[in-house]
Amino acid sequence: MVVEVLRLGHRGDRDKRISTHVALTARALGAEKIIFTVEDEHVESSVKKVVENWGGNFKFVVEKHWKRYIREFKKRGIVVHLTMYGANINEIMPEIRELSKEKDILVVVGAEKVPKEVYELADYNISVGNQPHSEVAALAIFLDRLFEGKTLYRDFENAKIKIVPSNHGKVVIREK
């Protein structure tokens, strides 16, 4: 299974930090690619710098034709839209996990008001709670549940920086 995240919309300076966090969360918790629908060189370079230093093969892509991307993706996988209006994650996650054994997953998270077409194109509209909260939180919970916690402490290949879990102090290994 390959997991990709589609960041739908991005409002320049207003969303720069949160969009970066969406991408970093996607990378850290098991996604292989993030797709932005709007170009932002600052966010892209921040994410690529993290990949360069912390390792892995995470990809950053800009695709302005998001509807076409979703339709094409559906030929090989399922589309999951994270929204507070969706079905309860606890009820639907076993089905998603079962499907993920044979299909890739595209997770859609919005930055602004999500167009009605997203709800219609998605195979699943899933809520991580029914209260307002961050798309970063929703994505983190979804990916953690999807991978059942297995991605939290994985090693990233080609990492120049690694953290060694420690109860006391900071233990950082840097490649020389």
Whereabouts are the PLM-identified features?
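Mobile, glycine- and charge-enriched loop segments
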Residues: 1-15
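Histidine-anchored nucleotide/phosphate-binding helix
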Residues: 15-30
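Short, structured coil segments at secondary-structure junctions
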Residues: 30, 75, 121-122
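Short internal beta-strands
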Residues: 32-39
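Short, well-ordered beta-strand core segments
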Residues: 34, 79, 125-127
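S-adenosyl-L-methionine/SAH cofactor-binding core of RNA-modifying enzymes
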Residues: 44-114
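Structured adenosyl-cofactor binding patch, chiefly the S-adenosyl-L-methionine
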Residues: 118-167
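Long, charged alpha-helical interface segments
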Residues: 167-176
